[in-house]
């Protein structure tokens, strides 16, 4: 008799029992997705766009758009439509490979809309429903990076770049921003 299986079996029965009593555990929601679009060579953005879960006040500026949706699935799919519509060549973010993409992907799985959500590629026939991943090894350790396949678009994670190219006491966004602009970043 294999005694190593006993704790696993007991845990399985416990989980089955708890699932009958308690509702299924849900994760955190995607409450908003903010995107800024700029044309290469221009200093001004042409669109500041925010997709929100639930209602919020609108901003009366032509280049700023707020879209509100009643459920998280619609929030996620609205961002996919935005990427398809604006058709960016380059997508830049901070820790998007370590947090944003994996988080949104997990939420799309929870909302059963992964196939629709993952339509970011410029190749209309490309249908992938998993994140691509790769590992990088830095002095501080090995890191797994996860990102959606977006054929025809360059994706840059500034967080990964900063950890690789700069030795800083902190890689929090406010510290890195202050370091790069040589001034203290003010929070509002």
Where are the predicted features?
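Metal-dependent nucleotidyl/phosphoryl-transfer cores and adjacent nucleic-acid-binding surfaces
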Residues: 1-188
């Amino acid at each position: 008799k294999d005694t190593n299986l006993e704790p696993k079996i007991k845990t399985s029965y416990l989980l089955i029992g708890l699932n009958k009593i308690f509702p299924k555990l849900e994760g955190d929601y995607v409450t908003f997705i903010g995107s800024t679009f700029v044309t290469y060579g221009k200093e001004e953005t042409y669109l500041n766009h925010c997709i929100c879960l639930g209602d919020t006040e609108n901003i009366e500026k032509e280049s700023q758009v707020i879209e509100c949706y009643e459920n998280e699935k619609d929030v996620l799919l609205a961002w996919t439509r935005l990427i398809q519509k604006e058709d960016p060549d380059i997508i830049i973010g901070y820790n998007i490979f370590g947090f944003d993409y994996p988080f949104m992907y997990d939420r799309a799985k929870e909302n059963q809309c992964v196939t629709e959500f993952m339509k970011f590629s410029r190749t209309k026939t490309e249908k992938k429903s998993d994140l691509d991943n790769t590992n990088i090894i830095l002095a501080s350790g090995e890191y797994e990076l996860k990102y959606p396949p977006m054929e025809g678009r360059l994706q840059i994670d500034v967080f990964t770049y900063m950890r690789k190219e700069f030795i800083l006491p902190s890689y929090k966004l406010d510290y890195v921003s202050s370091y790069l602009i040589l001034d203290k970043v003010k929070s509002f």
